Amino acid sequence: MSAAALLAPAPAPAGAPPAPEYYPEEDEELESAEDDERSCRGRESDEDTEDASETDLAKHDEEDFVEMKEQMYQDKLASLKRQLQQLQEGTLQEYQKRMKKLDQQYKERIRNAELFLQLETEQVERNYIKEKKAAVKEFEDKKVELKENLIAELEEKKKMIENEKLTMELTGDSMEVKPIMTRKLRRRPNDPVPIPDKRRKPAPAQLNYLLTDEQIMEDLRTLNKLKSPKRPASPSSPEHLPTTPAESPAQRFEARIEDGKLYYDKRWYHKSQAIYLESKDNQKLSCVISSVGANEIWVRKTSDSTKMRIYLGQLQRGLFVIRRRSAA
């Protein structure tokens, strides 16, 4: 039998209903639809299985994460407890490291403090020695100055006493008590015997100095010149002293003080300047001007360091003459 005969439909029997017509395209479509449905069901089943497995895996991972987190917490807690125990025992490495650093800082500060204390102590000792030397020097200077002032004061009193003695010698004759000249009459027979008159000797007059030394000396020289020639003058009177050109009353010198300086004989003199001082008795003294006041100057002798006070009036009248050492 040929293939065409095999493929041809069999003839229907008689009296049978007619067979339906057969279309091969429709069968293929039905088969493809069934295949698609079966594949779709298979895919859905696979997806459901996959979803279930993923859910189980997620749950398992979450449990593992929680367990791992708990383990990390326990490890961290145990580490902290161990570090706390080491800290209490003093064996913690970080604690020892920081303690070593603090100890170094402490020793450094102690060393700096000791150096600062030593420096301050040396500075205080130097200041103490310096102040002590200054105090000793000031004490010695004040002592010398006090001694010089006392010597000058005593010299001044000595001069006043000598001037007073000289004044008493020059004016002694005027203070003598002269007897009263009375006429004696003859006593009558009936008159009582006269009682002698007892008179007290008048006390010597007291001298009150209201003038300066140079004015007193000038008055004494004037009185000495006017005194009577019958009474011999004492050798110590100014009349027997050798006269110098400086004692001439007609010769006067210009002397004044301005701005702490002395202007004398057309020259300026200042403090601490070396001079020669010539007095009325031809004494020539080497002196140094100690100070310049308002109306007088103080000079210090270089021989014994005693001080003398010279008034402007004495310089103007020529009782003392000042010359520079270089020009003298």
From Swiss-Prot:
The keyword Plastid does not apply. The modification N-acetylserine is found at S2. InterPro entries: Sds3 (IPR013907). It is found in: Nucleus. Residues 10-21 have a biased composition (Pro residues). It comes from the Eukaryota. GO terms for molecular function: histone deacetylase activity; histone deacetylase binding. The modification Phosphothreonine is found at T49, T244. Residues 23-37, 45-54 have a biased composition (Acidic residues). Pfam families: Sds3. The modification Phosphoserine is found at S32, S45, S53, S228, S234, S237. Residues 64-171 form a coiled coil. There is a cross-link at K69, K178, K201 (Glycyl lysine isopeptide (Lys-Gly) (interchain with G-Cter in SUMO2)). Its main location: nucleus. GO terms for cellular component: cytosol; nuclear body; nucleus; Sin3-type complex. Keywords: Acetylation, Apoptosis, Chromatin regulator, Coiled coil, Isopeptide bond, Nucleus, Phosphoprotein, Repressor, Transcription, Transcription regulation, Ubl conjugation. Residues 2-170 are annotated as: Mediates interaction with USP17L2. GO terms for biological process: apoptotic process; chromatin remodeling; negative regulation of transcription by RNA polymerase II. Polyubiquitinated. 'Lys-63'-polyubiquitinated SUDS3 positively regulates histone deacetylation. Regulated through deubiquitination by USP17L2/USP17 that cleaves 'Lys-63'-linked ubiquitin chains. Residues 1-64, 226-252 are annotated as: Disordered. Homodimer. Component of the SIN3 histone deacetylase (HDAC) corepressor complex. Interacts with SIN3A. Interaction with SIN3B enhances the interaction between SIN3B and HDAC1 to form a complex. Interacts with HCFC1. Component of a mSin3A corepressor complex that contains SIN3A, SAP130, SUDS3/SAP45, ARID4B/SAP180, HDAC1 and HDAC2. Interacts with USP17L2; the interaction is direct. Interacts with FOXK2. The C-terminus is involved in transcriptional repression by HDAC-independent mechanisms. Belongs to the SDS3 family. Regulatory protein which represses transcription and augments histone deacetylase activity of HDAC1. May have a potential role in tumor suppressor pathways through regulation of apoptosis. May function in the assembly and/or enzymatic activity of the mSin3A corepressor complex or in mediating interactions between the complex and other regulatory complexes. This is Sin3 histone deacetylase corepressor complex component SDS3. It comes from Bos taurus (Bovine).
